[in-house]
Design a protein with these regions (language model features):
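Generic short alpha-helical segment signal, independent of protein family or function
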Residues: 44, 55, 73-76
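Structured helix-beta-strand junction loops
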Residues: 26-27, 53-57, 96, 114
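Short, acidic/turn-prone active-site loops that include or flank metal/cofactor-
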Residues: 34-36, 56-58, 106
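Active-site neighborhoods of divalent-metal-dependent phosphate/nucleic-acid chemistry enzymes
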Residues: 12, 18, 60-119
Length: 119
């Protein structure tokens, strides 16, 4: 399973993405309420149909505020150029034992070296 970030979904909606299509067909895509929320704010063709489909995808484990805070402190994520929603998604991907697929270069680099929020 892979947690697919908003940036990947935006590219998929604009231009398509065969890898994301394959992962969707194989049932290997996770989502998160924050990703769905960000997509809701976008201008999406066939909006209701798309949102209905993405809402039916399995959800990543949602990190608590304490878990995200611990992740930020443990990994010294402050001043690294990622946002709080990014930190939530990062914590959720770690807790779900699923990689985070993002086109955000900073978030991608951080996700590859982060330690779990607890433990």
């Amino acid at each position: 399973m892979v947690l697919v970030d908003t940036s990947v979904w935006v590219g998929f909606l604009r231009e398509g993405d065969s890898l994301l299509s394959d992962l969707l067909n194989e049932g290997e895509v996770l989502t998160h309420p924050f990703i769905i929320g960000e997509l809701r704010l976008g201008n999406i063709s066939k909006r209701q149909h798309f949102l209905s489909l993405i809402n039916d995808l399995p959800q990543a484990t949602q990190a608590t505020e304490d878990e995200v805070t611990h992740l930020i402190e443990k990994n010294k994520l402050y001043g690294k150029g990622i946002g709080y929603i990014d930190a939530h998604l990062l914590a959720s991907s770690i807790m779900s034992v699923s990689p985070l697929w993002t086109l955000d270069k900073r978030l991608d680099a951080i996700s590859k070296k982060c330690k779990p929020p607890i433990g």
